[in-house]
């Protein structure tokens, strides 16, 4: 237990605080002492010697007073302390094995040599190197250090060996860095080759898919289901009004004998030959009214021609281009088999092509929808390609494009001529002149006392009678002033309403006339 100076027991908290305060004071004392030492070490002994030399010169002249003597004594003591502290600092650094180049000496100029010969030898510098630093210049922020003055064990050989080691390391690093440059083009070339390899197979992929799609359902379907599937697929679509007529079987006039001389021979027979080779799937599409294969091929050709005429006139909702190319590259049997798979997605219902109905040939009736659908897809080259050309319209007249509503209403409402574009708003062409009281040309000669604001411009008042003024016009000038004084009350009594600016101006003129101002 700690006690105070009076012998009282201290509070443990106060005792602890007092102990901490003692430690802090001791630490601050050491820090201040270090700061003093650093300040002494930073002082340049050469400057102190110059100041002492100046004081000695003034002493020789006999101008050294008591204050200067005291200053000289302080400078001598400071110089001794600086030399002593520097020696202690150098010895301490040597014992610790550290270089004496510290930040505290960075502000000092280079130390003077006792002889000029040592200044001419850069080999004595610690930073000397025969190739990297032949002049022995110190790095920025550090003072020049020499082996002769400080007595360091570091020699130029050691520095050169260390620098040689550093140079060898840098050379090895350069050699390591030189090897990688040829490596980057190799992976780039590999990537280019690997990127270019998958590109060539991409173009042949569509024909392979086009060939595989029709051949995948190559086995013929059963005789009964295909028409039923068509029936099941078509009811969800909106049936056109002519669908019952198209569902009827064609008349017996359509036969192979009638169709022999109707169409010239062409490349369609290639499709017919393929159809005969794969006849298992073809006779299932038409109804039992169609007799033979030849009769099937002929109406198919006529069907293709009707489809061509329909495309030339107007085509509505053409099939997508991708399935058409695939079907054109495939065989007829594969096309007939793939028709059952792509019919709900590719081919429109039989009535859609007839909206609006295309003009059929003169000597041919509309065939069965099943027969028409079977030969529509494998023969697209005979019609125009799908796209904007079949949907072209005649050039529109100049002006805004007519809408469907305007086209419908154009036949109902009568024609109303448009208003001429030159008609503008009926603005007045006559510029209104300003009032007389607002024009300076008219009111420049009127005195300010007479310029009374017109309260109501619309109110017009009759002019007062001027009989009295005319009767007084021939009176002597001595009596004119009295007459004018009498006229004013007469006017005010006669006119109960306020006078206008015109009345006041006429009264002013009459007064001037009565005074003789207007006499010639």
Swiss-Prot record:
Primary localisation category: nucleus
Residue ranges with Pro residues bias: 198-207, 216-227, 235-253, 346-369, 378-403
Composition-biased stretches (Polar residues): 267-281, 300-312, 326-343
Lineage top rank: taxon: Eukaryota
Entry GO CC: nucleus
Motif (Nuclear localization signal 2): 52-59
Any one Pfam family match given in the protein's UniProt record, by short name: Wbp11
Expression sites (tissue/organ): In seedlings, mostly expressed in the shoot apical meristem (SAM) and root tip.
Keywords noted in UniProt: Flowering, Nucleus
Extent of motif Nuclear localization signal 3: 71-78
Spans through the membrane: none
InterPro entries: WW_dom-bd_prot_11
Compositional bias (Low complexity): 148-168
Record field: compositional bias (Basic and acidic residues): 87-97, 114-126
Coiled-coil regions listed: none
Observed phenotype of the null mutant: Early flowering in both long and short days associated with reduced levels of FLC.
Subcellular compartments: Nucleus
GO terms, biological process: flower development; regulation of photoperiodism, flowering; RNA processing
UniProt motif (Nuclear localization signal 1) ranges: 16-23
Xref: PANTHER family: WW DOMAIN-BINDING PROTEIN 11
Protein name: Protein EARLY FLOWERING 5
Species assigned in the record: Arabidopsis thaliana
Upper lineage: Eukaryota, Viridiplantae, Streptophyta, Embryophyta, Tracheophyta
Gene name of the record: ELF5
């Amino acid at each position: 237990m700690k006690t105070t100076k009076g012998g009282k027991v201290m509070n443990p908290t106060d005792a602890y605080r007092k102990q901490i305060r003692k430690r802090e004071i001791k630490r601050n004392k050491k820090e201040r002492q270090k700061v003093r030492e650093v300040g002494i070490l930073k002082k340049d002994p050469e400057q102190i010697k110059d100041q002492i030399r100046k004081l000695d010169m003034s002493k020789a002249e006999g101008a050294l007073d008591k204050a200067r003597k005291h200053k000289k004594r302080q400078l001598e003591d400071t110089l001794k302390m600086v030399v002593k502290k520097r020696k202690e600092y150098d010895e301490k650094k040597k014992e610790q094995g550290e270089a004496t180049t510290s930040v505290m000496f960075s502000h000092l100029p280079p130390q003077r040599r006792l002889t000029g010969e040592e200044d001419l030898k850069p080999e004595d510098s610690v930073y000397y190197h025969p190739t990297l630093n032949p002049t022995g210049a110190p790095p920025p922020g550090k003072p020049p250090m020499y082996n002769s003055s400080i007595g360091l064990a570091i020699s130029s050989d050691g520095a050169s060996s260390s620098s040689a080691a550093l140079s060898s390391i840098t050379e090895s690093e350069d050699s390591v860095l030189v090897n990688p440059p040829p490596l980057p083009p190799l992976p780039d070339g590999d990537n280019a080759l690997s990127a270019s390899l998958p590109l060539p197979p991409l173009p042949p992929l569509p024909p392979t898919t086009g060939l595989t799609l029709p051949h995948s359902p190559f086995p013929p379907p059963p005789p009964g289901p295909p028409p039923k599937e068509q029936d099941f697929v078509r009811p969800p679509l909106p049936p056109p009004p002519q669908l019952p007529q198209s569902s009827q079987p064609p008349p017996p006039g359509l036969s192979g004998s009638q169709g022999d001389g109707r169409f010239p021979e062409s490349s369609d027979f290639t499709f017919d030959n393929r159809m005969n080779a794969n006849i298992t799937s073809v006779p299932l599409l038409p109804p039992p009214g169609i007799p033979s294969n030849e009769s099937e091929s002929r109406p198919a050709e006529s069907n293709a021609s009707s489809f061509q005429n329909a495309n030339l006139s107007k085509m509505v909702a053409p099939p997508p281009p991708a399935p058409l190319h695939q079907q054109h590259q495939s065989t007829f049997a594969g096309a007939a088999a793939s028709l059952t798979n792509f019919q709900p997605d590719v081919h429109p219902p039989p009535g859609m092509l007839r909206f609006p109905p295309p003009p059929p040939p003169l000597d041919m009736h509309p065939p069965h929808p099943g027969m028409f659908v079977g030969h529509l897809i494998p023969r697209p080259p005979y019609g125009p390609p799908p796209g904007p050309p079949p949907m072209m319209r005649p050039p529109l007249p100049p002006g805004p494009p007519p809408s469907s509503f305007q086209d419908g209403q154009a036949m109902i409402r009568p024609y109303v001529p448009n208003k001429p574009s030159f008609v503008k708003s009926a603005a007045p062409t006559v510029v209104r002149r300003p009032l007389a009281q607002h024009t300076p040309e008219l009111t420049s000669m009127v005195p300010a006392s007479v310029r009374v604001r017109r309260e109501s411009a619309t109110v017009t008042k009759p002019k007062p009678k001027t009989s009295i003024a005319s009767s007084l016009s021939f009176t002597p000038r001595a009596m004119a002033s009295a007459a004018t004084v009498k006229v004013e009350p007469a006017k005010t009594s006669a006119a109960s309403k306020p006078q206008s600016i015109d009345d006041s101006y006429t009264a002013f003129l009459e007064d001037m006339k009565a005074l003789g101002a207007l006499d010639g």
